Amino acid sequence: MVAPRSRVLDVGCGDGALLDYLVHFKQVDGRGMELSQAGVNACVGIGLSVIQGDADTDLADYPSGAFDYALLSQTLQATRDPKGVLDQLVRIARRAIVSFPNFGHWRMRWHLLTQGTMPVTPCLPDAWYQTPNIHLCTIRDFQQFCAAEGIAIEQAIAIDGQGRVAPIRSYRWANIFGEQGLFLLSRR
């Protein structure tokens, strides 16, 4: 989804694995923002340009259109203000790429139905009382949110547990079988 030699901001970049890949294999001009000092240190240690920052408050400091892409990988559900963060992403970049765990996946539903407890999965490895996830959504929730907020979905992909990818628009059961949603967004 990321074009070679583009300007990229990876928000919530963690240890920098994705940003490092994009810098070395797609020759992007990559920058990162990470909340944890340990993550910033890991990124800087491998030569990445990363600052410590909070997506909920610090994205407002970037000028409009500063990047070609703003990435938010597996971070949206941990933000305090997902709407505000998404508004900032599509403001500071021509396109935003957002991925998140799909809380509508059939295994999640089945676990809640049969066990009555919040599931712990490879995609969501923390117990409910230890998780950073505070805003849970499904693929369908996210699509409805984007429509209501004037955010265009240019491409949408559901990813299952084996890494298989299916386009969401042509895959009727994406909300049930996709463990993760991956969206390419822009401002309408």
Language-model region placement:
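Conserved SAM/SAH-binding loop
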Residues: 15
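Short conserved loop adjoining the S-adenosyl-L-methionine
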Residues: 58-64
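Conserved beta-strand/loop positions that form the S-adenosyl-L-methionine
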Residues: 11
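Conserved alpha-helix/loop element of class I SAM-dependent methyltransferases that forms part
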Residues: 1-5
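Class I SAM-dependent methyltransferase SAM/SAH-binding core
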Residues: 21-58
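A short SAM/SAH-binding and catalytic strip from SAM-dependent methyltransferases
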Residues: 69-80
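S-adenosyl-L-methionine-dependent methyltransferase catalytic module, highlighting the catalytic core
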Residues: 83-88, 95-188
